[in-house]
Amino acid sequence: MRKQPTVFEKLGGQAAMHAAVPLFYKKVLADDRVKHYFKNTNMEHQAKQQEDFLTMLLGGPNHYKGKNMAEAHKGMNLQNSHFDAIIENLAATLKELGVSDQIIGEAAKVIEHTRKDCLGK
């Protein structure tokens, strides 16, 4: 029996992640709701970490070597509105890259599972 494709595969695999992350951060860094969180961030390193994390989270190969989400976001006082902004920017990025609303929804559903850890709740 053939296994169902992962969200990572449905998105287009590593090439899609590699295309999406820079565009995603362009949107995030222009978003007044969240851009201040990245003021003193090495964005090259952040983008690599994000690409690896999203790849792993969405069902691709696990090359993520960063902190867990609770530790990575500890002390940032993130609120639901901040998490929502990130999801919205990612959805807009994927839409711009031609991903269907259905697959964007599938990705958002998987990412939603990290909300509590990211918000420290």
Curated annotation (Swiss-Prot):
Monomer. It comes from the Eukaryota. Keywords: Acetylation, Heme, Iron, Metal-binding, Oxygen transport, Transport. The keyword Iron applies. The modification N-acetylmethionine is found at M1. InterPro entries: Globin-like_sf, Globin/Proto, Globin_bac-like_CS, Hemoglobin_trunc, Hemoglobin_trunc_I. GO terms for molecular function: heme binding; metal ion binding; oxygen binding; oxygen carrier activity. Belongs to the truncated hemoglobin family. Group I subfamily. Disulfide bonds: none annotated. Pfam families: Bac_globin (PF01152). Its cofactor is heme. Binds 1 heme group per subunit. Heme binds at H73. The keyword Iron applies. This is Group 1 truncated hemoglobin. Transmembrane segments: none annotated. Gene3D superfamilies: Globins.
